[in-house]
Amino acid sequence: MACRYPFSPAKVAITRFFYPSPLSRSTTPLFCPPSCRIRVGNTSRMLTSSSSVASENPKSEMAKFLASPNPKSSASEPGPSPHDVLSAPTSAGHISEAEETLSDQLRNPGSSSSSSPSQSSTNNLSSKNAPFKLSSTYSLPSNISVPPEVREHLIEWSKNVLEHSRYVIQEAQKKFVGLGLKVNEMTGYQEVERLKYMVFEKEDELQRLREHARTAKAAYDEAVAARSEAQRETNILLERKHSWTDADVSKFTSLVRSDHTSSHAVASTSIALKDAEIAVDKSFSQLMQVILQRYHEEQVWSDKIRSVSTWANVAGLAINFIIFVGAVLLVEPWKRKRLVEKLEERVASMMERVDHRLEGVEGHLERVAAGSASASAIKEQHSDAAIQGVEDMPSNSTANPLEFVSPQTIPLMAAVDPTINGSESQSDPFFTQTIRGFPNYLDPLVKPSQKRDLAVAGMAGAVAAWILIGAVRLVRA
C-alpha cells in the first residue's frame, strides 16, 4: 500500500490488520492510520493513498483525478497533515462513499450531527490539535444528534444572550462611571483630580526644562573650553612671534577668528543657560504652587467628607434612637400584650382539660368510696358474726378470725385495706432502718421490707461463699 508518507514495517502490518481486504466479511476499517486520510475542509479532496487506488482501478474517475491534480488547488493549499485529515478507504467503493460524504458535508456544513463516525473522529482530532479559541456561540458535541432547526435556534439564542449580556455589562460600566463622576462633582473631588493632573504636567515640564538647562550648560562649557583652547594656542604663538612663518600667520588669523567666534558662543550660551535656569526656577515655583493648591483642595475635600461622615453618624444615631424608643414604647407593649393573650388562651385550654380530668377523678373517687363503705359494712357484719361464733365456741380461742370471712369478700376488703390477706399473714422485716437520698425506683431496697431482707441475705450468702471458696483455694495451695 503506497502512501504519500512512507510506512515502517510495523505500520504496514498494523495497516493490513486494521484494513481488511474487500473479500473479507468486514469492509469497514476499524482504525485509520494518520498518514492515509482525506482532509475535510479541503475542496481539492486529495487522497494520500493515490497510487493504490489508481492501481486497483486505473479507468476510474478518481484515478484520473488523482493522476492529474489541479495545480491551482495543489499550489494554494498544502498537503494533508496527520492531524487534520480523515481516514482513506482502500477500495473504490469506499472512495466513492467518502466522496459522497464529503460532497454532502460541503453542501450542508451545518448538518454535522448526521455525519459518519470517521468525520466525527476527524472533528475531534482537529478540535484537540487546534489552539484554544473562545467562541461566541454555543456549540453542541458532535456525538449528540440534534435537528438542524433546533441547532439553529440554539445558536441564535446563544448569540442573543451573549449580545444582551455584553450590552448589560457595558451599560452597567457606563452607569458606574457616571455615578462616580457625579459623586466626585458633588464632593468637589474633580478639582483635586484636575490639580493632580496639573502636578503631573508641571513635573514633566520641570523635567523637560532641566534637560534643556543641562544641554545649555553643556553647550556653555563646550564654548568656554573652545575659547580657552583658542586663547592658549594664541598665547603659544605670541611667545614665538619673532620666528613666525606664513603658516603661523595664517594659523594666528584662524585662531583670532575662532576666539572671536567662541567669545560670541560663550555669550550666547551663557544667556541661554541663564534663561534655562530662570525657566527651571519658575517651573519649580509653579510646581510648588500647584502642589500647595492640591494639598489645600484635598484638605477641603477631606473636611467635607469628614463633616458628611459626622452628620451621617449623627443621623444614624438619631435613627437608632428613634427605633429604640419606638421599640420600647410601641413594639414591646404590643409583644407583651400578644404574649399575655396567648398565655391566657393556653391557660384556659389547660384549665378545661384539668376540669375534665377532675370530673373523671371525682367519679372514680365516688365509686371507690362506695366500695370502701360496702367493704367496711361487710367487715363489721363478719366481725360481729366471728365474735358471736367465738362466744359460742370458747375452746377454739386461737382460730384465725379471717376464717369466718367468705372468700368472695376478701378481694373487696383487700382493695380497701391492703394489709388484709386471706392466705397468709405478713411478718415484720428484720432491718427496720430506712436509707434516704436514693431515687424512688429504689424504694424496695431503701425502705424496710421482706424483699430487702431477702436481698441482703442473698448478698451476705454470696460474700460468705466467695470467702469460703477463697479460703479453700488458699488451703489447697
UniProtKB/Swiss-Prot annotation:
Question: What does the record list as coiled-coil region(s)?
Answer: 190-233
Q: Which domain of life is it from?
A: Eukaryota
Keyword annotations for this protein, in alphabetical order, are: Coiled coil, Membrane, Mitochondrion, Mitochondrion inner membrane, Transit peptide, Transmembrane, Transmembrane helix
Instruction: Name its cellular compartments.
Output: Mitochondrion inner membrane
Entries under Pfam families matching the protein: She9_MDM33 (PF05546)
Compositionally biased intervals (Low complexity): 111-128
Q: List the disulfide bonds.
A: none
- Look up the record and give one Gene Ontology term from the biological process aspect: inner mitochondrial membrane organization
Q: Where is this region: Disordered?
A: 49-128
Q: How does it sit in the membrane?
A: Multi-pass membrane protein
Q: What is its main location?
A: mitochondrion
> Which residue intervals are topologically Mitochondrial matrix?
476-477
Q: Which residues lie on this side of the membrane: Mitochondrial intermembrane?
A: 332-454
The answer on whether this UniProt entry bears the keyword Transmembrane helix reads: yes
Q: Where are the transmembrane segments?
A: 311-331, 455-475
Identify one Gene Ontology CC term for this UniProt entry: mitochondrial inner membrane
Asked whether the UniProt record includes Transit peptide among its keywords, one would answer: yes
What family is this protein classified in? Answer: Belongs to the SHE9 family.
User: What quaternary structure, including any partners, is listed in this protein's UniProt entry?
Assistant: Homooligomer.
Query: What's the protein name?
Result: Sensitive to high expression protein 9 homolog, mitochondrial
Question: What organism is this sequence from?
Answer: Cryptococcus neoformans var. neoformans serotype D (strain B-3501A) (Filobasidiella neoformans)
